C-alpha cells in the first residue's frame, strides 16, 4: 500500500488567478478520501494534477513516498476510473481489462492471472467474452474498475464514476465500491458533486469551494461540526437552516433579522452585540407548544416524503425547514410551535462565515 501527499499545491492558468489555492493534504496508506463540491470548485482539476494530466503551478505531490510532481502519468503508479467508462467497443471485457498490461509488455500468463482475479472480485467471470454493448451500465463500470485493478496501482483515482448511472444503480455501485475498498485496501482519491456518495463512501471528506479546501474531516465531523457557512449549506439534505441576526448586548438572546428572538441560555457573552448566522438542521428542530415557550412558525408548504415530512415556513424573510415524523401532517397555514435545542445550534461569524 502507499500514501498520497499534496504539499501546498496550487494551479493557475494565466499566472495570476489561482484556481487551486495553496492546498495541503495527507492521505494515509489505504485511506479512501472523497473530494466533494459544486461544479467549478476545482476538485477535478486537483485530481488531474495528481494524475499528471495537469501540471502543478507550485507545490509538490508525493505518491508512495516518491516525489512525482514532474513525472509522466504512466510513471506515477496510479490508475483512473472515469465517468464515461472509456472502454474499447471492439474488444471483449477480457481484452479491455488486459489491454493496459499488454501494451506495457507484461507476459501473457501474468496478464491472464490478474484479469482472472479482478473478474472474480468484481463478479465478471461469466462476462469476459462479451463486448461493452452487451453490458448494462453497472457492468461497464465494473469493467472499467477491473481495468484499473489489474494494474495494481499505488493509488486509485475516481473521477465521478457513478454519474452516468441511474439512481437505483448508483446505490448498488456505492455498496460495491465500499466492499471493493475493504478487500483491496488501496489508497483512493474520489471526486464527486454528490454529497450522498461523499458521505457514504469516504473515510474522510474534503469539501471544496472556489479552489479552497473548506473542511477536511470524517463524514460525521463534517455533518455535525461544519467549519463554515458553505459546508453547513452544502452538506445535508435538506440543507442546514441558516438564520442571519445578532447576539443581543447581554448575550442571552439571538435576534433574527425579522423580529423573532431566540433564547440563549449561556456561553454566548463573548459574542454579545455581534452579527452572526445561527444554524440548525431541520431534523434537530423539535415540536413544542405555546405554553412551553415554543416559537411560532406559520407553515407554507408540506412535502410528504414517505419516511418523514418537511414543513416549510418563514421567519420574516428567512426560510425555515423542519423535518417531521411521518405521522405529522399539518396543513398549509397552520402554526407550528417549535423548540430549537441549544446543544444543536451552530454559530457562524457574520463577516468571515467561519464557525465560532
From Swiss-Prot:
**Organism of origin:** Escherichia coli O6:K15:H31 (strain 536 / UPEC)
For this protein, the Enzyme Commission number is 7.6.2.10
Q: Where does ATP bind?
A: 37-44
Q: What is the primary gene name for this protein?
A: ugpC
Q: Which residues form the ABC transporter domain?
A: 4-235
The record's comment on protein family reads: Belongs to the ABC transporter superfamily. sn-glycerol-3-phosphate importer (TC 3.A.1.1.3) family.
Q: Which GO terms describe its biological process?
A: carbohydrate transport; glycerophosphodiester transmembrane transport
Enumerate the InterPro entries for this protein. AAA+_ATPase (IPR003593), ABC_transporter-like_ATP-bd (IPR003439), ABC_transporter-like_CS (IPR017871), ABC_transpr_MalK-like (IPR015855), ABC_transpr_MalK/UgpC-like (IPR047641), Mo/tungstate-bd_C_term_dom (IPR008995), NA-bd_OB-fold (IPR012340), OB_MalK-like (IPR040582)
Q: Which UniProt keywords apply?
A: ATP-binding, Cell inner membrane, Cell membrane, Membrane, Nucleotide-binding, Sugar transport, Translocase, Transport
Q: What name does the UniProt record give this protein?
A: sn-glycerol-3-phosphate import ATP-binding protein UgpC
What Gene Ontology molecular-function terms does this entry list? ABC-type glycerol-3-phosphate transporter activity; ATP binding; ATP hydrolysis activity
**Where is it located?**
Cell inner membrane
Q: How does it sit in the membrane?
A: Peripheral membrane protein
